[in-house]
Each structure stands twice: as C-alpha cells, then as structure tokens.
Amino acid sequence: MKFNNGKSMKYLRIFFASIISFLFFISCSDIREDIPISAPKITLHKDGIKNPASPNFHGKLVSNANWDMKQCQQCHAANYNGGTAESSCYNCHKTPGGPEACNTCHGDFANTLRIAPPRALNGNILSSDRGVGAHTKHLYDNKIGKVVSCNQCHIEPASGFSDPSHIDNTPGAEIVFGSLSKLQTNVSGGFNYQSSLGNFVPNPGFDVSDGSCSNTYCHGYFKNGNLDNIVLFTAQSQGAACGTCHGNAATGNPLPKTPSQGGSHPPSLNCQQCHGDVVENNNGNYTIVNKEKHINGKLNVFDNEFEF
C-alpha cells in the first residue's frame, strides 16, 4: 500500500494507535477482574489409606515404620487433632489416646477394655498364632484361675506410647516376668512348712524359639507341684489341663506330690474336703468353683487362705 501524502500517513498512525490503546485497555480491565481458579486437590496418601484391606492402609505404613508415629504427627499435629493437614485422627480413633491407644495396634479396636491380642500386630485372631496365644486366657477369660495384668509378663510403658520399653528396634514383645511367676513357696512360717523340702524359688524362663514358659509359679513351680512343667503359649486348653501344674498330666489326676513322691500332700483325691472353696470333685470330674482363689499365690484350706 502506498501513501502519497503525509496527512494520510498521519491518520493511519492515529488509527493503529487507537486500536492498540483499545486492546490494551480491554486487557487491563480483564486482568483487574478476579479470575476464578479451581485449586487442584493435593493428596499425600494413596487410595486405600483408610481401608484395612488395602496395601496402602495407614496401619501398614506405621507398621513398616516400626510403629513410629512421628511421621503422622508431621501433618496431623503432635496431638493428632488435625495440624496442617486439617484432618483429625480422632475422626476414627475416638478412644482416649487416639492413635496411641493400646487397642489401636493390638487388641479389639472397638473395645478399649480389650487391649491385648486378639487382634495381634499381624492381624491374626487365632490362639494358635504366636502373637495371639493365651493372652485372652491370662487377661480376660481365665476359667480356672485369677486373671493377671499385662505387667506380669511385659513392661508397661511408663512414659507413653514411644517409651523405649515399648517401641524399640528389636522385633517382638519382650517377656519380663512379674511377681506372681516368681512367688516362692514352702517359706518358713508358711502353712505346713516342711524344712526338709527347702524353699521352692522359681526362676521363670521364656524360650523365644518355641514360645514356651518354664519354672514359673503359675504353671507348677511350687511346693508339691510339677517343677519341670513347660507350657507353650499356643497350647490352648491343653496348657492348663488338670494334672499339668500339679498331679499327672497324662491321666488328668490333679493330686499334688505325696510323701511317697517326695512331697507333703495327703494321698487323698477328695479335693473338696480341704479345698471346698476352690474345687469340686464329681465322680472324677474336677471343677473350679471359684477361680479367684486358684493360682492366686495363696493356699486355700478349710475356707481360709494361707502363705505356703
């Protein structure tokens, strides 16, 4: 295009300048307006983080981190109330202690009174599993003896969940025997003390290879008891069958050692004659009638309890 005079060129320049100014004005107006933004959702966890059946379940992540909850606290706060993630762990972990409650990792997640396996750390609920074993029999549903507390076999953490006695770098739960398993019998001044027999001083042991207990008062290491009794933690009902702790395990005869066997118990099978508060004998069928008075560290004779 050719322009023959300066006036036409001037008008053309004014025209283009007007268009540019108009476009600039429109652009500035658009920029000054709020632009709707759809912020992308940022997620740290993979799908299935709340699903126990998922490989991405957060319980598995904590297990893989050797039960270190600090990684959770980085986003959910030290008290698990939400933190920067703005998602409180107490939405699901509703019991006192939240994620650090005893029944979170082992026991019944729905029942704060059942803090020991089952469930075991591996999720198993069968008593034939090493992690489950006889926990229920010892702590909750003992039909033949007084129930015990956790500290009779384990150290209870003094400073909370992360206490070194609870969370450490060694796999499995440490067995630290309490006072009941170490109870001495035939002590001087006790009921029917026999100086010739000496003191019976248990030296409790736990065999990690097979999960067995030995030399414990609770399973036979007492005066007139079966000192060499070894019981598997997974033995189920056979671990406490009549005759295992005192008497003859093969026949089920519960008669403790008599003088002819190196003991001091009278050779009588009429248990209830002397121990009526504890046991009944109906035609050879022995039934514990008061479990609170059996395996409780005392000798119950004629409705009275004695040190022995």
Annotate each language-model stretch with its function.
Residues C28-N66, Q73-Q74, A78-F308:
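Flexible linker/context regions in extracytoplasmic redox proteins
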Residues M1-I26:
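Sec-dependent bacterial lipoprotein signal peptides
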